[in-house]
């Protein structure tokens, strides 16, 4: 009976103890292998096996006895455990002495650099603010706009400042106008109710109800849908103003002119910011996205430069840093920049679809570089210096008509006697590396240099077409340059392919060479550079189309609405404060959605599970990878799931924040409704306390005492400056107030943009603007009246500002530290899903079910999203460090080390995914008996890793201690290799190994043909590197277990 791959119903090796006594009778079950010389049994696992044995011996673990019990049921697995040991405490990093104060010259240079970058933003911000102040200080204009309430005009300018792209500014202006209209409509309704049929005798209760409803709705809307925050703030400001500005005496008619005063002032502020944004240093997003692509190409070029630079080629830390920077440039900065571009109205010269294709093709081209072995030893200092000296003397070849690199070229080289001798003498490690270096170093150097030249040309071309005045002749020059790069790149790829074939036909692939880690790294390095170059040709082709389609066009937002509604533009997120947290939550939502989509996607070519089992009478069996194992949804009823989503949104954290926010808002407005205080509350404009509270509050800003001190200090400075502006000679002189505005606005604007102190600067400017203008409109200007008005209003602003931060410290508190545990839990879950996909879809995939284009595309999305999630979580750690230590000391170094291991784990998963698609693990087994014997052990290895991931994920999400007994991933994998080597030795002793009893290959495959032999060689290389990557995953996972126990604690301790 034929053994079905992936079926756990077959007997395991432990149940086949008589296998070693069967002699040669097992020969019919032997699977054909293709090369005796290059595929020794166990060679692809021997290096990893040796490493695991050393780790097991050196760690002092004591394996627990399993008494020979074996799990044979579907859906269960056997795990290997070690006796728990006390986790050694990780020493915190040595704290360095505080840095000495930078010299004055250095600080002046840093100041000049910041000024050179942000001077346009400072000018735009200052012009808009001063224009708003001038309109308020010119009495005829201010009387018509809104009289004393014209101070809403500069406040609206400050909230919606013009230093944004035109598309974003237009969007937030429309949002705020809608919020203003809704707020005035809502308030007009309640004012009408308060003035009809004597209902308004106790209008405070009605206004209280109005404010409660509006506060709940506006705060929930901003918390649930981040993109609508400006509509929510405008609605909240308007509703709060009208809830506290009713006439102070019962029976008085409402002053309906207040609707004109507040509405026109706020509207004029919105339109003024929009006009300044459009006409003064306008930004349409065109140059920004062009610079983003250019910067990403430059970072890739730097990595390749270091690889062929004699000074840095052996500097592994420098190369790792350049590699990480290149990965971050593509996966994070370029990706975020394109999302920013696609999420807004843009006036650009780029075609949106071609720009997306360029982003995707550049991401694919950079993907092999993140798994590039850096210690390959293929390029040495001496050779690089020699190649660089010889390169200027040889003119580059511009071959225009070159066939595609994937075409098969006839190799004219023949096996020389020298090559044969080299192949026989390839036993030395150094000699193996020298042979590969001799054959490939010059060719790969030329290919890397051509890649650098292509990236440089791409960077220059992007910079040129990003300019608004690029001419047709310049575009023609760009096209000619890119075509030359494309031709040269094809030629270099062809030469490398010829070298491949020469190397394979020379008989240099030997078992000794393959068992040399340096050799396998060098061969993988060649393949990854070749893949990068091949994908780079696609990048250049897309850029040629982009260059040919350059003309001005308007591109509307094309981001998916269900994701765009939660995404706030970068500048707006900075303005809201705690931009790290905004970025973290946006990234977390995108990553969760992407993983749910990917994890539940069926990419197999077998449309039904039963397609794998076409025989009659056989029930469908559980596959090696089942998407229902860890599905997010616990119900298949769509209506029930939608109801759960609705209930979660109404009663979730957003709703809790809305209730807490509204309680504080009502408390700040309460004096405006009480008979004993509502007169002075309106007279001294204390209604600005709840208004500034609405403006400054942020649900996801934990902050600390230092942030509170800075915000309050800014408020005191603003109030003091406002009193000084009115108290100066010629009381409340508009020219003096305008002068004071200029003197305050310029440094604060620089502080706003250059140092990203957004909320404290905004609070300072509002606390200057409101007291200055309110005092300016007083009928009587005396020293006492100016002091009383300015400081009474200022104290109200201080109270509202003070409440905007501690609200997050009490009742349903938000802290970055509590969120960090959930972030780590999510990362563990996503890493587990990625591991399961790699194991099920790549390593143990079904027969004739190779990963297709869809599978690879989803893998690329998954890897990019995980990289973004890791960086966002690192930013969350930095936010957690700034929080005060109240209950216990926060050990950030443990989370930093944990995330470092996550990063290594992710890179190994990416490496395993790239390698696993090139070989079939079942073909590495010598016979079907071995495959059947190893099925349960392979199941145990994968299932143990997944089980550990999910146990740790649940511990972090619930805050529970880590169980004392968890499977030891090193022991489980070592057990698999032990069994594999024992089977190989038994088969060799019986004389039934593939070396002596391999049946003839199928008729359609000639194992002696050069192409078949070359493929066998590369299969062996990929298998060795894959085994090493999967072993690294087990090693890293054991260290993650120890760190989790140190962070959360261990049960029983």
UniProtKB/Swiss-Prot annotation:
Region ranges (Disordered): 1-38, 991-1014
Glycosylation sites: 464, 469, 547, 647, 701, 1003
GO cellular component: membrane
Membrane-topology annotation of the record: Multi-pass membrane protein
GO biological process: endocytosis; protein transport
Listed Polar residues bias regions: 9-25
Compartment(s) of residence: Membrane
Keywords carried by this UniProt record: Glycoprotein, Membrane, Protein transport, Transmembrane, Transmembrane helix, Transport
Top-rank lineage group of the source organism: Eukaryota
Predominant location category: membrane
Database matches in InterPro entries: Brefeldin_A-sensitivity_4, IVT-Associated, Memb_transporter_dom
Transmembrane regions listed in the UniProt entry: 117-137, 143-163, 177-197, 205-225, 228-248, 262-282, 661-681, 735-755, 760-780, 794-814
Family assignment from sequence similarity: Belongs to the BRE4 family.
Functional note: May be involved in intracellular vesicle transport.
Protein name: Protein BRE4
Organism this protein belongs to: Eremothecium gossypii (strain ATCC 10895 / CBS 109.51 / FGSC 9923 / NRRL Y-1056)
